[in-house]
Every structure is written in C-alpha cells, then in structure tokens.
C-alpha cells in the first residue's frame, strides 16, 4: 500500500487550487497548470491543504492516489517556485546559441541542429556550452532536456556529448593491443 497519498499537499501563500469535477487547476505567481484527476482518486481541498483519498473497491486506488499526490505537489511547486534543468555540452566545437525561442546546437554533425522550445519552457545560454531550461511544468522541462540530450548522448570513451549538469558519465578504458 502506498504511503505517499497519506501526506496532504500544503498550499503556500499566493497559490490557488480549484477542483471542477475531475479537473484540478493550480494557479500561482509563475503561471497555471491543469490536470485531469484519475477516477480512482477523491480530491478534497480544505484549509490550505489538498488531501487525496482512494475510491473504495478499486484495486489500485492507493497507487493512483500516491501518483496523483506527487503530480499535484509538482504542480504546486512549479507555479510557486518553478523548475530548472541544466545541460552541459562537452566536446570540441560543441556550442549552443539561443535564437528567439529556438536553441541552435552545433554538435559535430555536418549541419547545425535547431530545437524548437514548446510553450511554457524558456531557455538561457549563460555560456556557449551551458543550457538552462526553466518552466512551471516539471514533466515538460524534463522532456525537453531529454530531447536535447538525445541529439548527442555522452559516450563512455571520451565523455563527449550533451549531459545533465549533475550527471556522472561512466568512463571506459580504450582497447589495448
């Protein structure tokens, strides 16, 4: 049985949570997010907290309640503080440049790659080899970061590629004669 759902989500000052049938909307200083709640979960909003209760008779209701609680907590944190993901480009000639709402990547291919940023994600390039993605939706930030990393994942022999800032690349030794 999941114990995650037993802890309520506290609503900080400046954040408004509303429930309309099975649609939960969270509004805050950085934006607003909407999510459809699973039918196996009852959501109760009271006195600055959101509680999640499983529906009786549904076999995986506790699991769904725990998942819903984690997703709603990420929504509350996103609209109040926001999320950020840092990427680092490692390799000779690897560069990133922000052009409008697109990221222009030079990753050793014969052509530059242009990655279009979806709505709700902003990017910043403090240096030519660093990318900082910011937004309110944790899942969307992670998805965009994974797509950019997917163009040139770090390889184990020289460590070249696009990596997360906190990622440790396991290095291999080259073949010996």
UniProtKB/Swiss-Prot annotation:
One Pfam family of this chain: Ribosomal_L6
Biological-process GO terms, alphabetical: cytoplasmic translation
Keyword field contains Ribonucleoprotein: yes
Protein keywords: Ribonucleoprotein, Ribosomal protein, RNA-binding, rRNA-binding
GO molecular function, one term: rRNA binding
A cellular-component GO term for this protein: cytosolic large ribosomal subunit
Subunit structure: Part of the 50S ribosomal subunit.
Function recorded in the entry: This protein binds to the 23S rRNA, and is important in its secondary structure. It is located near the subunit interface in the base of the L7/L12 stalk, and near the tRNA binding site of the peptidyltransferase center.
Record HAMAP family: Ribosomal_uL6_B
Protein family per UniProt: Belongs to the universal ribosomal protein uL6 family.
Full protein name: Large ribosomal subunit protein uL6
Organism: Shewanella baltica (strain OS155 / ATCC BAA-1091)
Gene from which this protein is expressed: rplF
